[in-house]
Amino acid sequence: MVCWLRSRWRPVADNDYRSAPGTEPFVPDFDTGAHSQRFLSLAGQQDRAGKSWPGSTPKPQEDPVGVAPSASVEVLGSEPAATLAHSVTVPGRYTYLKWWKFVLVVLGVWIGAGEVGLSLFYWWYHTLDKTAAVFVVLVYVVACTVGGLILALVPGRPLITALSLGVMSGPFASVAAAAPLYGYYYCERMSHCLVGVIPY
């Protein structure tokens, strides 16, 4: 109220739209005299109402001179009918892997993992300070797990997927290969063994 008393402008109420329309949508009135036309915001409104613009009366479509309707039908009928496109077989690669390839890939990885397991167990058994051997075993297990997960991320390559399964199961193959060596060392001191490697 203090600002209004000092100012010479009268404040406008919020609901007073006639004196201050603001950004309210409105239709402008183009009054050009006696023959003024009402402004249309959309050109399609007259078409919907069935009216037409002045001077835009559609002309009747005339047939070309010397051409009968039957002739035009014959021309259209003489064109060949559109044929459907046949499917084309594109050579691609298998999205699956044959079982013998899978077995070969996994066995190849397991043979390498078995050699690693035998070496690590032999080193752990004969060394006095077993800290380094245990640390290498931990690094080997982590490397197999991470490597298998990274290989499994390759899309659309079933051979790489089989390789990832072999790499992730590598530590189990290493344990299975080191188990007979452990049984052999155990049976050197114990007499109750089967085939010299299986204690009972």
Swiss-Prot record:
Signal peptide: none annotated. Keywords: Cell membrane, Membrane, Transmembrane, Transmembrane helix. GO terms for cellular component: plasma membrane. Its main location: membrane. The keyword Transmembrane applies. It is a multi-pass membrane protein. This is Protein Rv0461. It is found in: Cell membrane. Residues 47-67 are annotated as: Disordered. The chain crosses the membrane at residues 102-122, 134-154, 159-179.
